[in-house]
A protein has these predicted regions:
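N-terminal FAD-binding dinucleotide-binding subdomain shared by FAD-dependent oxidases/monooxygenases
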Residues: 1-30, 45-46, 59, 74-211
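Active-site acidic short loop of glycosyltransferases
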Residues: 8, 34, 51
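A short, basic/flexible loop-to-alpha-helix module at the beginning of a structural domain
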Residues: 37-51
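N-terminal Rossmann-fold NAD(P) dinucleotide-binding loop
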Residues: 63
Length: 211
C-alpha cells in the first residue's frame, strides 16, 4: 500500500488463514455510547475492564480465548452464543531459551518430518488405531491422555478415524461433552454449552485456556 516493489525467489506470507476482520452489522453499534472492541483490531494500549459490565458476542476462537481473561477483570460478564462449540485445552508452556536450545533445535529435523507427513501439518505422531477397535476403557484412557496434553494432538494423535467415521467421532464428541458437564457446575448452563449439531473436528477446532 506504500507503492513499494519487492522481488524474492521465495515468498512466505505469515498473515494467517483468517486475516480480514468481520465487524457484524449490529443495529446501534456505531451509536453505542460505551466502549466497544473487536478482537481483530485490538488497541495497542491496555484495555481496563475492572468493575465494568461487559458483553462478549460470539464463542468462536477469539471468543473462547478472550472470555476467560475478561472474566477475571470484569465486574459482570455476559456471553452471547449462537452455536455451542467443542473446545480443547491448549496447555501452553513457557517457551524459554532452555526449551529452544535443548528441546527444539536438536530436534528440528524430526519436528519438520512429523509436520510434513502428518494430517494438517502438525508435528504430532499420528495414531494407527481406530477408536472402534479398542475397549471402552482404552478409549477413555487415550482421550484423557490427549486432554491432559492439550492442543491439536488431541484430535490428530488420538485415533485415526475420528474425522472419517461418524461412530468413532461420536465417542470423542461425547467425551468432550462429558468434560463440559464436569467443568460447568450449573446443569442448565452446561446444557447450553453442549455442542450437538455437528461432529467434533467438522469445524475449526478451538483451543482455549481456562474457558
Amino acid at each position: 500500500d506504500q507503492g513499494d516493489r519487492v522481488t524474492a525467489q521465495f515468498l512466505i506470507t505469515g498473515i494467517g488463514c483468517i486475516s480480514a476482520g468481520n465487524v457484524p452489522d449490529i443495529k446501534g453499534l456505531h451509536s453505542f455510547q460505551g466502549e466497544w472492541y473487536h478482537t481483530g483490531s485490538w488497541p495497542h494500549e491496555k484495555v481496563d475492564f475492572a468493575g465494568k459490565r461487559v458483553a462478549v458476542i460470539g464463542t468462536g476462537s477469539s471468543g473462547v480465548q478472550s472470555i476467560p481473561v475478561i472474566a477475571e477483570q470484569a465486574g459482570h460478564l455476559t456471553v452471547f452464543q449462537r452455536t455451542a462449540q467443542y473446545t480443547i485445552p491448549a496447555r501452553h508452556a513457557t517457551v524459554d531459551r532452555r526449551f529452544l536450545e535443548e528441546e527444539v533445535k536438536p530436534n528440528y529435523a524430526e519436528i519438520l518430518e512429523k509436520a510434513r507427513w502428518s494430517h494438517g501439518g502438525f508435528p504430532v505422531d499420528p495414531s494407527e488405531r481406530s477408536a472402534l477397535e479398542v475397549t471402552a476403557e482404552e478409549r477413555l484412557e487415550t482421550y484423557e491422555s490427549g486432554w491432559a496434553g492439550g492442543g491439536f494432538g488431541f484430535l490428530f494423535g488420538s485415533f485415526k478415524d475420528l474425522t472419517t467415521d461418524r461412530r468413532a467421532n461420536d465417542t470423542v464428541s461425547e467425551f468432550i461433552r462429558s468434560k463440559i458437564r464436569e467443568m460447568v457446575k450449573d446443569p442448565e448452563t452446561a446444557e447450553k454449552l453442549l455442542p450437538t449439531d455437528h461432529p467434533f473436528g467438522s469445524k475449526r477446532t478451538l483451543i482455549d485456556t481456562d474457558y
